[in-house]
């Protein structure tokens, strides 16, 4: 078993069984080389290039521009792996969802999961790509302990989709505006296993549960110029795969992983600079900060006449120090010795198959944003509502029940969003229905209840469910709209507060708010606020 898991490995390995599961342990020589290389890189980092992330934008303004591209790996939410029938579930016991095929045993043959092809075509269409009617698989060969076959099944020269683009809208706080970033290609491949490192750093264990899990790699054009643009591109891609249902897109689980290529060049120069790949970024915020730091590092080397120190390499982002460090020299395509996968036939598609997928596509984030924008909503509202497909569906359903778009957006973005944040819930986990939100909005607009009472009812509906009508009747919350009743309460409040009334007459007109509050308190929040302010104003004017 150990020889199969790590065949071709020249460093001693130890295999052991624990609770019925195999663990393969990588002894210290190879691991030590990796660790020593990273530590030496940290120690050797020149003091002059250890810049704070916030300086990146200032450095960029000094005659240079960044050129940024992203390679994104999306783990597909299929029932089984790409080339075998093993299931995969994040967090499973190590080496519990493996078989001879995904473990790379000699003589085993891969069988393509048709769902992987469907997901690839679906994402390719969503990215406005040209879909290849015929594509093929290739072997990408390299050595690493978590790659038991010694190669990865991928696609090289004929990907399933190419030459597309992704549209997005930048948030106002990042400058706003529309952006379009090119997509070079989308291709299918399998994932590798995972190394589990010991706390002491003296050994690593190999978990092959992830080996063979289907991935789609999306390669962007080098169209981005800032860390913010790159982070927003990644966030939009995450949004897209979630809308499509092809992946959960969770970065924390490794379902969406972004490797960034960064280079800088003098403004006006057409040739690209030497690109550096950055890995180990587990959030979109980290992507932005890592890129900004790397831009600063490269620009400073240029300005100090040390541009030759920028080499094609892979660097790791270190969250604690907020810096990038050398991991390894970057391989070229020739190093992988690609050649066609002999055990898999070509993937041949038909126009009918592609049309069927196209016709089943949901409304995508870009189209949804444009539709919401046409309702007269601000871009801030649009971005919030379209960010999560569940929120967007809740909003749409509320409108279908007759609610005003702006009022519905305000409730969802305000009180409902605050509740979800505090309780750490998603909108599909609460008991409030779109119908009842629509009824709540209508009850406030027609004067049945006040806005203040509406907020109280909302919390009850979110937590316990029920209907607006039943809560109003049960708690006697119908708004008081009888002028005589409100006038009587105003008279009583003015009579009970002679000192404040005298101060009002002396010019402290802000006390009108105090009197209004006392009336609302007396009415238990049920007094019609418009009618209350009208009657109170008339009474105060008469008493002046």
Curated annotation (Swiss-Prot):
Q: Report the GO terms under cellular component.
A: chloroplast; glutamyl-tRNA(Gln) amidotransferase complex; mitochondrion
> Which SUPFAM superfamilies does the annotation name?
GatB/YqeY motif, Glutamine synthetase/guanido kinase
The reply on keyword Cell inner membrane is no
Query: Which chemical reaction does it catalyze?
Result: L-glutamyl-tRNA(Gln) + L-glutamine + ATP + H2O = L-glutaminyl-tRNA(Gln) + L-glutamate + ADP + phosphate + H(+)
Which Pfam families does the record cross-reference, listed alphabetically? GatB_N, GatB_Yqey
Listed A to Z, the keywords are: ATP-binding, Chloroplast, Ligase, Mitochondrion, Nucleotide-binding, Plastid, Protein biosynthesis
Coarsely, its chief localization is mitochondrion
MF term (GO), any: glutaminyl-tRNA synthase (glutamine-hydrolyzing) activity
- Localisation per UniProt entry: Mitochondrion; Plastid, Chloroplast
Alphabetical list of PROSITE patterns matching this protein = GATB
Q: What is its EC number?
A: 6.3.5.-
Task: List GO BP terms, alphabetically.
Answer: glutaminyl-tRNAGln biosynthesis via transamidation; mitochondrial translation
Q: Does the keyword Lyase apply?
A: no
- Other observations noted: This protein may be expected to contain an N-terminal transit peptide but none has been predicted.
Subunit and partners: Subunit of the heterotrimeric GatCAB amidotransferase (AdT) complex, composed of A, B and C subunits.
HAMAP family reported for this sequence:
GatB
Q: Which family does it belong to?
A: Belongs to the GatB/GatE family. GatB subfamily.
Task of the protein: Allows the formation of correctly charged Gln-tRNA(Gln) through the transamidation of misacylated Glu-tRNA(Gln) in chloroplasts and mitochondria. The reaction takes place in the presence of glutamine and ATP through an activated gamma-phospho-Glu-tRNA(Gln).
Q: What is the name attached to this protein's record?
A: Glutamyl-tRNA(Gln) amidotransferase subunit B, chloroplastic/mitochondrial
Q: From what organism does this protein derive?
A: Oryza sativa subsp. japonica (Rice)
């Amino acid at each position: 078993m150990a020889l199969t898991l790590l065949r071709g490995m020249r460093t001693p390995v130890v295999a052991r069984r624990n609770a019925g599961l195999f663990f393969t342990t990588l002894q210290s020589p190879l691991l030590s080389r990796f660790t020593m290389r990273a530590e030496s890189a940290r120690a050797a980092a020149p003091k002059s290039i250890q810049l704070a992330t916030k300086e990146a934008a200032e450095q960029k303004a000094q005659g240079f521009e960044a050129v940024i591209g992203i390679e994104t790996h999306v783990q597909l939410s299929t029932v089984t792996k790409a080339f075998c029938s093993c299931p995969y579930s994040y967090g499973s016991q190590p080496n519990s969802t493996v078989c001879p095929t995904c473990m790379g045993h000699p003589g085993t043959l891969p069988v393509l999961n048709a769902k992987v092809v469907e997901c690839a075509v679906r994402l390719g269409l969503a990215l406005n790509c040209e879909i290849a009617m015929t594509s093929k698989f290739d072997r990408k060969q390299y050595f690493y302990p978590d790659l038991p076959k010694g190669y990865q099944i991928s696609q090289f020269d004929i990907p399933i989709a190419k030459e597309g683009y992704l549209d997005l809208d930048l948030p106002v706080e990042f400058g706003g505006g529309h952006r379009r970033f090119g997509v070079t290609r989308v291709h299918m491949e399998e994932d590798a296993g995972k190394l589990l490192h010991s706390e002491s750093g003296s050994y690593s264990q190999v978990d092959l549960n992830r080996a063979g899990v289907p991935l789609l790699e999306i390669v962007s054009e080098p169209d981005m110029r800032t860390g913010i643009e790159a982070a927003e591109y990644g966030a939009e891609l995450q949004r897209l795969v979630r809308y499509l249902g092809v992946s959960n897109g969770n970065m924390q689980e490794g379902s969406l992983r972004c490797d960034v290529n960064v280079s800088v060049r003098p403004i006006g120069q057409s040739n690209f600079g030497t690109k550096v790949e950055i890995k180990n970024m587990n959030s979109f915020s980290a992507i932005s900060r890592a890129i900004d730091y790397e831009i600063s590092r490269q620009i400073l080397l240029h300005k100090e006449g040390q541009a030759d120190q920028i080499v094609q390499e892979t660097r790791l982002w270190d969250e604690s120090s907020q810096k990038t460090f050398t991991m390894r020299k970057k391989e070229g395509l020739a190093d992988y010795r690609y050649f066609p996968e002999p055990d898999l036939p070509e993937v041949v598609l038909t126009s009918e198959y592609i049309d069927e997928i196209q016709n089943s596509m949901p409304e995508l984030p870009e189209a949804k944003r444009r539709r919401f924008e046409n309702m007269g909503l601000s871009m801030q509202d649009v971005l919030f509502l379209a960010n999560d497909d569940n929120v967007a569906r809740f909003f749409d359903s509320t409108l279908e029940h007759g609610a005003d778009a702006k009022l519905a957006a305000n409730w969802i973005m305000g009180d409902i969003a605050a509740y979800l944040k505090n309780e750490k819930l998603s909108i599909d986990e609460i008991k409030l229905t779109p119908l009842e939100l629509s009824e709540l909005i209508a009850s406030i607009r027609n004067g049945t209840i006040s806005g203040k009472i509406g907020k109280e009812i909302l919390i009850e509906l979110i937590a316990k469910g029920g209907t607006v009508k039943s809560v109003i009747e049960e708690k006697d919350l119908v708004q008081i709209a009888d002028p005589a009743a409100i006038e009587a309460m105003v008279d009583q409040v003015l009579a009970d507060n002679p000192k404040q009334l005298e101060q009002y007459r002396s010019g402290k007109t802000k006390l009108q708010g105090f009197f209004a509050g006392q009336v609302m308190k007396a009415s238990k929040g049920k007094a019609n606020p418009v009618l209350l302010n009208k009657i109170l104003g008339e009474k105060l004017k008469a008493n002046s």
